[in-house]
């Protein structure tokens, strides 16, 4: 029985572009996420 390939192939640029700060700030929902994390006092807001 063959196993599937490992699906997590780390890539910092892709990580930032998909989950980064600038992407979050683009939409109203994204800004809400940032605001919630600021309210909670998260040390890191985004990837």
UniProtKB/Swiss-Prot annotation:
GO terms for cellular component: ribonucleoprotein complex; ribosome. Keywords: Ribonucleoprotein, Ribosomal protein. The keyword Ribosomal protein applies. GO terms for biological process: translation. One of its GO terms (molecular function) is structural constituent of ribosome. The keyword Metal-binding does not apply. Belongs to the bacterial ribosomal protein bL34 family. This is Large ribosomal subunit protein bL34.
